[in-house]
Amino acid sequence: MATIKEIKELLVTVKELESPIFLELEKDNRSGVQKEISKRKRVIQAELDENLRLESMLSYEKELYKQGLTLIAGIDEVGRGPLAGPVVAAAVILPKNCKIKGLNDSKKIPKKKHLEIFQAVQDQALSIGIGIIDNQVIDQVNIYEATKLAMQEAISQLSPQPEHLLIDAMKLDLPISQTSIIKGDANSLSIAAASIVAKVTRDELMKEYDQQFSGYDFATNAGYGTAKHLEGLTKLGVTPIHRTSFEPVKSLVLGKKES
């Protein structure tokens, strides 16, 4: 009779819920064996569910594949709302039918998984472009226009250039066919890939700024208006990376000028 350890090693090779190996092992009434069977079935079911989820996020891409297009770029940005730091956009071209396990809207990915999935995108993408527009430009042209500039910069770095753009809730003035998708980072794998690249890139930048400008907790809040960030603003004032067109930074700058 096989040991439970041997059965556990055998079960790792089973990839289908209908496998005859399950049927045979279910005759073994040892509780340890039944526990390992249940555990393996849960893993297989989770993998099937994940594959279905990823498949559903390729619906926009598949429509474009039918038209003979393969160089499809997903575009997304991070950093519209913070009081400090740049807005960062990424453009990513994935191989046809590419499925990266765990890839999703970056806001839905556990923080501890960010770097792992970012690396998987880096490893598998055909091309990646990153656009970074700093706070000074944001203050000059407004955050909406700055976001478009960041996206255009990211797209310009792609090689080969894309045949079609899938963009998260935005239209760009570019001579490339494009589809604007509401909640695109949750509905398109290409946009989700861009989302995690932009997120990790910006988070790393804000960690560097945290070393330059201590007291604002940039490494944790990424420039968003948390209690610690606002406390830092009150105590230490405005840094060179703060967006002076955003409140309450704007009022602090005006108050300083008037005093």
Swiss-Prot record:
Chief site of localization: cytoplasm
InterPro entries in the cross-refs: RNase_HII (IPR022898), RNase_HII/HIII (IPR001352), RNase_HII/HIII_dom (IPR024567), RNaseH-like_sf (IPR012337), RNaseH_sf (IPR036397)
Catalytic activity field: Endonucleolytic cleavage to 5'-phosphomonoester
Record GO biological process: DNA replication, removal of RNA primer; mismatch repair
E.C. number: 3.1.26.4
Broad enzyme group: hydrolase
Binding site for a divalent metal cation: D76, E77, D168
Cofactors required: Mn(2+); Mg(2+)
RNase H type-2 domain span: 70-258
Keywords linked to the UniProt accession: Cytoplasm, Endonuclease, Hydrolase, Manganese, Metal-binding, Nuclease
UniProt remark on cofactor binding: Manganese or magnesium. Binds 1 divalent metal ion per monomer in the absence of substrate. May bind a second metal ion after substrate binding.
Protein name, as recorded: Ribonuclease HII
Lineage: Bacteria, Bacillati, Bacillota, Bacilli, Lactobacillales
Gene: rnhB
